[in-house]
Amino acid sequence: MAAATVVVPAEWIKNWEKSGRGEFLHLCRILSENKGHDSSTYRDFQQALYELSYHVIKGNLKHEQASNVLNDISEFREDMPSILADVFCILDIETNCLEEKSKRDYFTQLVLACLYLVSDTVLKERLDPETLESLGLIKQSQQFNQKSVKIKTKLFYKQQKFNLLREENEGYAKLIAELGQDLSGNITSDLILENIKSLIGCFNLDPNRVLDVILEVFECRPEHDDFFISLLESYMSMCEPQTLCHILGFKFKFYQEPNGETPSSLYRVAAVLLQFNLIDLDDLYVHLLPADNSIMDEHKREIVEAKQIVRKLTMVVLSSEKIDEREKEKEKEEEKVEKPPDNQKLGLLEALLKIGDWQHAQNIMDQMPPYYAASHKLIALAICKLIHITIEPLYRRVGVPKGAKGSPVNALQNKRAPKQAENFEDLRRDVFNMFCYLGPHLSHDPILFAKVVRIGKSFMKEFQSDGSKSEDKEKTEVILSCLLSITDQVLLPSLSLMDCNACMSEELWGMFKTFPYQHRYRLYGQWKNETYNSHPLLVKVKAQTIDRAKYIMKRLTKENVKPSGRQIGKLSHSNPTILFDYILSQIQKYDNLITPVVDSLKYLTSLNYDVLAYCIIEALANPEKERMKHDDTTISSWLQSLASFCGAVFRKYPIDLAGLLQYVANQLKAGKSFDLLILKEVVQKMAGIEITEEMTMEQLEAMTGGEQLKAEGGYFGQIRNTKKSSQRLKDALLDHDLALPLCLLMAQQRNGVIFQEGGEKHLKLVGKLYDQCHDTLVQFGGFLASNLSTEDYIKRVPSIDVLCNEFHTPHDAAFFLSRPMYAHHISSKYDELKKSEKGSKQQHKVHKYITSCEMVMAPVHEAVVSLHVSKVWDDISPQFYATFWSLTMYDLAVPHTSYEREVNKLKIQMKAIDDNQEMPPNKKKKEKERCTALQDKLLEEEKKQMEHVQRVLQRLKLEKDNWLLAKSTKNETITKFLQLCIFPRCIFSAIDAVYCARFVELVHQQKTPNFSTLLCYDRVFSDIIYTVASCTENEASRYGRFLCCMLETVTRWHSDRATYEKECGNYPGFLTILRATGFDGGNKADQLDYENFRHVVHKWHYKLTKASVHCLETGEYTHIRNILIVLTKILPWYPKVLNLGQALERRVHKICQEEKEKRPDLYALAMGYSGQLKSRKPYMIPENEFHNKDPPPRNAVASVQNGPGGGPSSSSIGSASKSDESSTEETDKSRERSQCSVKAVNKASSATPKGNSSNGNSGSNSKAVKENEKEKGKEKEKEKKEKTPATTPEARVLGKDGKEKPKEERPNKDEKARETKERTPKSDKEKEKFKKEEKAKDEKFKTAIPNVESKSTQEKEREKEPSRERDIAKDMKSKENVKGGEKTAVSGSLKSPVPRSDIAEPEREQKRRKIDTHPSPSHSSTVKDSLIELKESSAKLYINHTPPPLSKSKEREMDKKDLDKSRERSREREKKDEKDRKERKRDHSNNDREVPPDLTKRRKEENGTMGVSKHKSESPCESPYANEKDKEKNKSKSSGKEKSSDSFKSEKMDKISSGGKKESRHDKEKIEKKEKRDSSGGKEEKKQYPFHLNNALNQCMESFDADNVLKVYSSVV
């Protein structure tokens, strides 16, 4: 009772008589108005009486006063005596505790005074016996206590109710009979309850025992639930609520003995009582065993045991005894599982589930570990049954397959059971929740598994329909989320626990295939990586699966694919993720498993194939795996194996490709190109489109035909049966819109590989990644072009300007993607036009085709303008640019040979079929029909292509006049053509390489205005170093193919005069004088004749050799690899000249030796090429057979000119080309090595006659010109006599200080002899011979064959001069050439945009030139050739830009003075350098080999150059001087011509070599004055040309020297 506030104030007691008594009465009257016992007023009333009594005990108020007022108050309440007795009881206890006797006395007096108010009986109940004794109400308190004990014992401990059945068997028998009677009639629980009450009263039965008997009968009669529940509800209203729960708990405890087993009937009764809330679950739960902590411990123990099993299974077993031990352990574990202990909580749970009390069942499961309850089969089956009942109506409506009856499930009669689901929304109420508690143990009920999957499938169909409203869409999305959760937590784990149920797997795939692959793969990821770690059973299953997989994979071979495949299939039905993960790990280690594994996967289900795709992607994306090998230069073998496996498995089996393709796209977005290997393999295997650089020429030719020819002859492998697989790949790309994105990503990634990944990775790897990216783009684009319909392709590929400008696609890739679209467009337009007028003539068809081309290509011509700056279109027209990029080899030529080859193969095949006696007739007939059909297809395709090519050629014929504009020089036009068209496309693919070569030929054949074929070929061949160096491995292969095709054309023209005259003779592409635009090449004198063309071809071969040797000598990996690849590709047509081939052979041999241990891949390439080169050696020819060194008379006069200004001298074979080479060596030793290897290279040009270079028309040159040329010829002869030794002369390589490099291995004796010869003055006899030579020259000029010089004695004198003076002369001459031709650009190489002058040349270029001056065995002749070119070129400049020439005598005097001074300087410097030579000879004595004089002589004889001594051995040693002099005296006139020409050039070269940078200003000025005098006749000829090309030629000749080379060749000394 709460503490009451003070009710009676002390003032009332003090003034009791006056006012206090009245106030107290008034208070009590108010408090007595509420008669209840629970109100606060009742407590206040008690407090008021207590305080009044307490004042009496304290002595503040007399007891009489108090008794009087209490008497008055008694009238207010009837229960006044009881209240007052309670107050006295409290005061009795308080006063007993006090030691003050007075207070006790006052209390006794008060009670005595109030005895008339409270009865004695009430006081005896409330007060203490001792107090009662003091009041006199009892005699003795002791006797009272004894009597009270006796009464209580009689009342409470003496049995009055019968508890045991045997004590009152009649009563209990009647009770049982009452409860066990037939209850089907009108008997109600109320009637039975009245009878029970009567029996209890009559037979004194214990009510608790009666309740127990009722429960026992209820257990035995479960069918009368309603009756007994009603009876118990009525009965319990008379008992305490806890009684029923305690009785039930006592019953459960009875069965908790060690071997006790609780009956299911008891569980059921308890469950029913719980369902109807007659007992509380928490009250009953404490009576059940085992305890919760025991359950948790058991769960943990199961997990530990599962992990131990995993550990044991993964251990390496070496002996059979251990296997036996393992089997025994398995048996023991099975025995343990067979004897589960009695778990009353689970028994009650099962009962609750059976009656449908889901709420209480859920409460019990919540107190246990996850899935612990469901892990017991009975509980799992009970949950499954409840779910069966709940989903029955919905399943009947949407899940039952058509035609199936099914077995209906009866609903529970219990109204409190969960409501059944009528629609998908109802599933959210209870069903999904039930599945979550069931977990992986749905495996116990496959039927329910199938039902749920079918319901899910129906839901997905409804979800994917477009008719649903937005509100319904939100609800269905929630259901979808729940369905995915159920799939993750229940369906997939349950499948893992099922025993190889393929039907369930297929059923599940029926639902899974409606999910997008993102959902599927997320589910597979959860299944593989998390599910197996969450349940002890699944942990064991995972270990067992891996163990079994190991067993199968160890025994898998090609021979036992079928039985092993069946085992793999069986294992995969339940646990595909674990199995495939292990199989893929094995494939990554052992690539020889790929084929047997692929073959063994044919027994998988559809779901398993999809899981396999996911596992492959996960394996590819494994972040722990390195994608590169340890050397960081090659892609890891595991990735290559996976890629190969991907291609094979996706082709063979119907697996969804969307995920894999999206993965590759995502990797490309992230800038990672490694995984393109996957796409490459998939496209190759599925579509049969093979990308390889190892294609034969036959295959390449077949690839230029139609689709049928490509399939038959264009690939290495068998490309049949790809129709279905390529269709699947196409569908996957189109359905997920990945076709164009993948193309664009690959095109962009090509540059990304270089600029984003290039710095981090090894150059070799970057090249491989670039090639892989490019090849995959080509392959993928080819697949789209051949498989997509016209509509699909056009719909997806944007226009060319959008591709390039918006998507930043490189131009070559953009045109590659757009090309099929143009072809489709043109073809469809053409078909439309044909249909409009049927039966028209061929001419009309061509016209229609051209019309359709114009309609399609006109927008393209406009679009391409934005791709380049406007300046570009001054050189080439957009139409030409678009035409080049839009055509293919299919459009240009028909591969008749390929068609014929494939048709012949089919005929042979048909014959073999006829001859095969073992083949059944039906099969024979089928095969023959197939071959015949294929043959007809090929012939029809060939015919179709022929018609198409004819139409295309007609179109090109009409367009060609508008292709190239006359706004700029030919050189600029060719530059843009090569830069924007040829070079980007020739390295795009092997077919494009062939296309580029054939297109150049076609443009030539079409006689395209303003196109110089000669210039184009020269630019291609002149300097390939930079192009080769910048290529990747595959690009080098394609570039090699391009060069091979170009060389093939050139070789065809070179090999036969008739062919040359027919295909080039009258063509504007071979003009040597570039006239106005309208010129048609009709003037024969302006054409390059056959012999001079052969000289040009030799020059190109020399250029190729020089570039090749340079690349081989750099030591750079990419240079060496690429040039070897290029050389291998062009081997059929190069080298053709013996000495060039020998030079290459020596250099390649050296590479083989150097790289054997260092770089094995280069060694293999070099060895391969070396072997092939040796096999080609018998087909090589000497230089004099390759081109005629004696030029024809007519063309000796014919001039070659590049405009009114005349071109400067071309030194493309001599010094200018050398200044172009970047062959800088780091040490003197490396320079000497370069000498040995490149000697043969310069020999190529040594025997090449040089053409005269005049500025007049065909044969009518001015007299001044002739005289000038005559003077030059004499000078050459003199200088050659003085400076060329009788044996093979050598131009020394300049060192860094500008001095000559000494001959390393030349004996001292030779050097001394040489010095004495240099000091020998001219004899009288030699002077006489010189005069004779002048007369002979005059006669020759009169007969219109200028520049043919005779042998003279002065030549012998000049031969004695050292080669150093030739270098000086060449250096001075080249400088004069620059000064004399300032108004025109000095000719240079293809690659360099700057003028190639010796004066303006940077130090680096000078070093290059110095190294190149002495690299060849035939260097002397090379130097001569270069100087002749320089001399003649400068002569042309003189004709155009200088006053009339001086007299011949003055000119000769000037030459003599210059040469005398040069000789004096050379003698002085030679003394200084002699010491250096001797020292260097020792350092480099091992680098050069000596060649005996006999061998030197033999080589000279083979090349027809004995008189000139052009072939120089590798050794610096010269042949005996005397022998060579004698031979020279007996030489023929033609030999003399060559020799004088070469000696002059050699002399000039020696002057450059010896003089170097230290040449005095005085010498320079003198020679410059001489050059100005020589060029006196040039300006007179300017008038002859109607158009001005001076400025244009300046630009042109900065980067090109071909025309000048032609001029040099056409005028042979």
Swiss-Prot record:
Residues bearing the modification Phosphothreonine: T1384, T1442
Sequence ranges of Low complexity compositional bias: 1251-1262
Protein localization: Nucleus; Nucleus speckle; Cytoplasm
Chain intervals for the UniProt region annotation (Disordered): 1182-1586
Biased composition (Polar residues): 1415-1424
InterPro entries on file: Tho2, THO_THOC2_C, THO_THOC2_N, THOC2_N
Positions bearing Phosphoserine: S1222, S1389, S1392, S1416, S1449, S1485, S1515
Keyword Phosphoprotein: yes
Molecular function (Gene Ontology), one example: mRNA binding
Compositionally biased tracts (Basic and acidic residues): 1218-1234, 1264-1284, 1293-1342, 1352-1382, 1448-1503, 1523-1584
One of the Pfam families matching this protein, by short name: THOC2_N
Residues in coiled coil: 293-339, 896-965, 1464-1491
Motif segment (Nuclear localization signal): 923-928
Annotated keywords: Coiled coil, Cytoplasm, mRNA processing, mRNA splicing, mRNA transport, Nucleus, Phosphoprotein, RNA-binding, Transport
A cellular component term, taken from the record's GO annotations: nucleus
UniProt entry tagged with the keyword Oxidoreductase: no
Signal peptide residues on this chain, from the entry's feature table: none
GO biological process: generation of neurons; mRNA export from nucleus; mRNA processing; neuron development; RNA splicing
Subunit field text: Component of the THO subcomplex, which is composed of THOC1, THOC2, THOC3, THOC5, THOC6 and THOC7. The THO subcomplex interacts with DDX39B to form the THO-DDX39B complex which multimerizes into a 28-subunit tetrameric assembly. Component of the transcription/export (TREX) complex at least composed of ALYREF/THOC4, DDX39B, SARNP/CIP29, CHTOP and the THO subcomplex; in the complex interacts with THOC1, THOC3, THOC5, THOC7 and DDX39B. TREX seems to have a dynamic structure involving ATP-dependent remodeling. Interacts with POLDIP3 and ZC3H11A.
Role summary: Component of the THO subcomplex of the TREX complex which is thought to couple mRNA transcription, processing and nuclear export, and which specifically associates with spliced mRNA and not with unspliced pre-mRNA. Required for efficient export of polyadenylated RNA and spliced mRNA. The THOC1-THOC2-THOC3 core complex alone is sufficient to bind export factor NXF1-NXT1 and promote ATPase activity of DDX39B; in the complex THOC2 is the only component that directly interacts with DDX39B.
Family: Belongs to the THOC2 family.
This protein's name: THO complex subunit 2
Organism: Dasypus novemcinctus
